[in-house]
């Protein structure tokens, strides 16, 4: 006979119940969620109509066509790779659907390239398709490709960063002086900024250099599947800036949910920016290792072992260096274990790791050969994590991360991986 009391009190049951409760809350209480945030969001004083009050009224109405913001939020996406273009598509669909909240036009900054003698921006704007990075997907007509990052960002209330993270410093320098003081940002970037003073989230890097609040978006999201409208989930993390003054202060959780949520792209908004960011960055390192064992033909058992050790090290890294992060984020959110599973099953990084094992070529060579101008973010994150762990004397506490570094950058044979994880 099953001991019902013991079952209900077990940690596994409690964790599953909490997840189910969150899912039910998201499915059946979206309207009350928006109303609650609209009521409890902090207010600010500004000349003329109070933008926050207008936003609250719109979000609390079941049909909001009769109310319109005096100045709707302008949204810009910085980046146009396959994930950048996919997020821009999602956002542009929502600015069309909610003209009371958002300006219809969405600018997408595009690094200008020549495609068969034509500018990529011209192709996108005329054919409504990113033929290089997201071919075969029709883009909304209100999504406008812009070759100038400064012009694209001008007057934007919300900036969505979605570029390879190794280019962030250069882009931020170009944006300085062109971002309005009241703007808000969401980072879809995966990686860290490492310096002599420590390891830093990329959202924090954006905040410090552009002086605007920045959240993060991450989840179990393979870009081609989202772009096709296949159902998936994601997590947006954003902390309301209590001590910030600006006209963008009414960009809160409810507004962000309206901006990113689609019938095929379900969004949960939380405040754990650190947890979401760490999970999104480190899963790419784990995916490289997963690719190694799959490429060696060791099968699913070995891949599962890599993911177990990887998840443990991801959580340990977050707790050690970003104590404000929440452990439950890694288990309950799409940006945690769900993203790890998806990335290890079919992302760019597992593809590169597998190809390294099968061909003997370097990660850098394969990135150029296989990814059509895209980046394998795990290659760069692996180096950043190693630099930081070496700097603070913690390398031995993260054997998987160090093993991936040694394989990618020092030529250690992949066959040594089990030995390097003996005590993990």
From Swiss-Prot:
Top-level EC class as recorded in UniProt: oxidoreductase
Keywords: NAD, Oxidoreductase
EC number of this enzyme: 1.1.1.8
Ligand binding (NAD(+)): 79-84, 111, 167, 223, 348, 377
Keyword Repressor: no
Catalytic activity: sn-glycerol 3-phosphate + NAD(+) = dihydroxyacetone phosphate + NADH + H(+)
InterPro entries listed in its UniProt record: 6-PGluconate_DH-like_C_sf (IPR008927), 6PGD_dom2 (IPR013328), G3P_DH_NAD-dep (IPR006168), G3P_DH_NAD-dep_C (IPR006109), G3P_DH_NAD-dep_euk (IPR017751), G3P_DH_NAD-dep_N (IPR011128), NAD(P)-bd_dom_sf (IPR036291)
Swiss-Prot/TrEMBL GO biological process terms: carbohydrate metabolic process; glycerol-3-phosphate catabolic process; glycerol-3-phosphate metabolic process
PROSITE patterns the record matches: NAD_G3PDH
Active site positions, chain numbering: 283
Keyword Transmembrane helix tagged: no
A GO CC term assigned to this protein in UniProt: cytosol
UniProt-listed Pfam families: NAD_Gly3P_dh_C, NAD_Gly3P_dh_N
Transmembrane segments: none
Residue numbers binding substrate: 190, 348-349
Disulfide bonds: none
Gene3D superfamilies: N-(1-d-carboxylethyl)-l-norvaline Dehydrogenase, domain 2 (1.10.1040.10), NAD(P)-binding Rossmann-like Domain (3.40.50.720)
GO MF annotations, alphabetized: glycerol-3-phosphate dehydrogenase (NAD+) activity; NAD binding; protein homodimerization activity
Protein family (similarity comment): Belongs to the NAD-dependent glycerol-3-phosphate dehydrogenase family.
Protein name as catalogued: Glycerol-3-phosphate dehydrogenase [NAD(+)]
Organism name: Eremothecium gossypii (strain ATCC 10895 / CBS 109.51 / FGSC 9923 / NRRL Y-1056)
Source lineage: Eukaryota, Fungi, Dikarya, Ascomycota, Saccharomycotina
Gene it is expressed from: GPD
């Amino acid at each position: 006979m099953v001991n019902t009391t013991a079952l209900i009190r077990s940690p596994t049951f409690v964790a599953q119940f909490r997840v189910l409760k969150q899912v039910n809350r998201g499915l059946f209480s979206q309207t009350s969620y928006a109303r609650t945030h609209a009521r409890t969001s902090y207010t600010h004083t500004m000349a003329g109509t109070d933008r926050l009050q207008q936003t609250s009224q719109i979000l609390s109405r079941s049909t909001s066509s009769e109310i319109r913001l005096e100045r709707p939020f302008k949204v810009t996406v910085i980046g146009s790779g396959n994930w950048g273009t996919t997020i821009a598509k999602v956002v542009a669909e929502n600015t069309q659907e909610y003209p009371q909240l958002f300006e219809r036009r969405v600018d997408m900054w595009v690094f200008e390239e020549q495609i068969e003698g034509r500018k990529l921006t011209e192709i996108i704007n005329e054919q409504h398709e990113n033929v290089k990075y997201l071919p075969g997907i029709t883009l909304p007509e209100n999504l406008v490709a812009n070759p100038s990052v400064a012009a694209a960002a001008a007057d934007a209330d919300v900036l969505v960063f979605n570029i390879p993270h190794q280019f962030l410093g250069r882009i931020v320098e170009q944006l300085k002086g062109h971002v309005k003081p009241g703007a808000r940002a969401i980072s879809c970037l995966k990686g860290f900024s490492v310096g002599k003073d420590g390891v830093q989230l990329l959202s924090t890097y954006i905040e410090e250099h552009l002086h605007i609040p920045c959240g993060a978006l991450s989840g179990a999201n393979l870009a081609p599947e989202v772009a096709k409208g296949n159902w998936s989930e994601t997590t947006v993390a954003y902390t309301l800036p209590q001590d910030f003054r600006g006209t963008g202060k009414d960009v809160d959780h409810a507004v962000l949910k309206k901006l990113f949520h689609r019938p095929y792209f379900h969004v949960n908004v939380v405040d754990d920016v650190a947890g979401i960011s760490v999970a999104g960055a480190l899963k790419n390192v784990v995916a490289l290792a997963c690719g190694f064992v799959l490429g060696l033909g060791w099968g699913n058992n070995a891949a599962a072992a890599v993911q177990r050790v990887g998840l443990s090290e991801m959580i340990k890294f977050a707790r050690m260096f970003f104590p404000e992060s929440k452990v439950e984020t890694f288990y309950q959110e799409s940006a945690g274990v769900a993203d790890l599973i998806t990335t290890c099953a079919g992302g760019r990084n597992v593809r590169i790791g597998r190809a390294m094992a099968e061909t003997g070529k370097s990660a850098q060579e394969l990135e150029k050969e296989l990814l059509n101008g895209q980046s394998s973010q795990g290659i760069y994150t692996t180096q950043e994590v190693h630099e930081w762990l070496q700097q603070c004397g913690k390398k031995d506490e993260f054997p998987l991360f160090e093993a991936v570094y040694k394989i990618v950058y020092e030529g250690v044979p992949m066959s040594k991986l089990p030995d390097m994880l003996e005590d993990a």
